[in-house]
Amino acid sequence: MKKNILLIFLLIFLFSRCKNIENNSDNENDNENSPIPTQRLSVNDFEYIGAFRLPVEGEETVNSWQWGGFALTYYPEGDKSGANDGFIGSLFGTGHAWEYRISEISIPKPVNSKNKNLSELPRAKTIQDFRDILNLSDYEIPRVGIEYLPKQAGQSSAKLYFCFGQHYQETSDLTHGWCELNLSTPQKKGDWYIDTSHHEYCTNDYLFEIPKSWADKYVDGYRLATGRFRDGGWSGQGPSVFAIAPWKQGNPPSNGTKLNHKVLLKYTSTEDYDQPQHKMKNYHNSDEWQGAVWLSKGDKAAIVFVGTKGYGECWYGNEDGPCLECDNRGWWSTELKGVLLFYDPSDFVKVAEGKSKPYEPQPYAIMEIDKYLYHIKSKQQKDHLGAAAFDRERGYLYIIEPYVDDDKPIIHVFKIK
């Protein structure tokens, strides 16, 4: 009899544990009660771990990683059968830059190759093949961001959020949506947009998670950050950040919905030449900000933009100097470097509370990382870095370096100490 009672209690305990795991599968890493950090992260808080290569399937087609790597997000529940090596979860990312199809890959244990030998790096494995979720084949030089979030209020499952645009986007196009994590049956929903000046250039190139405790306290639970920097400053003379929460406007919001938003960072567009020119310190029109992440570790945090920064003189023309009729025409600087640009979350608090204007926050630190990169061949090389993603629980920062491995990117890994 006692054995039967013990068995019943054991079964009840195991059942409750299974239900908890099931219920939490879309909500892990939410850290709902975690305190809001009060200190800044510094460049000395980062340790370089190494890098890894991406899968080779589909080469020479749009279903490959070649010329890709400009959107990335971390999925903590991915790759459940992966190696027990401390690198838990998976990554969703975009491939070939013509169509930005989405794939899911494993995260192998990175290797720090002292001689930057690609053959020493492990290779990720494909978990989900590339799928054409966004249908961007008609876009000229597309721009895309993606971000995973666990299920939010009113949702029955976690979502993969996306934003998209193109280099020249003069109409008020729709820019945002979401889909399911199963890429073969994505159930894409959208599209929506953010109604702000120059929204087609300042809202739709990167997405990142806002920590729940911060979002709940300062921006009414708007947990998704979105933004874009468009070279030449059409978007604003520096990166931008808008907090959004599409799930608060329907499950899903109807097609064409104007998303409610909260501006956290926005500088003056160069198109608004008749207004006061508020810009980021040391701004160059040649700057590139391909990704952004809200980093946190213990009592320290920072909003970090990942990209390529101009130094010295800046001009419109080609690498040799100003010109209007020349090859490689665009914005150039004397030197370009791959960097991480740090903003203080407390400055965003002031904006959210109406105590500062969205153009007032300024970066407090910059971290140059070219010494870790594999493909830098000239001081004016563009596209040093692609997108970024963050494993908040373990403190791993994943940063893409494009065009390294037969035109495929590799992924570098840093750990916040």
PLM feature spans:
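N-terminal processing/targeting junctions
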Residues: 13-17, 78
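Bacterial Sec-dependent N-terminal signal peptides
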Residues: 16-36
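Functionally constrained cores in energy, signaling, and assembly domains
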Residues: 4, 17, 354
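Sec-dependent N-terminal signal peptides
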Residues: 5-13
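Sequence/structural signature of beta-propeller domains
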Residues: 31-417
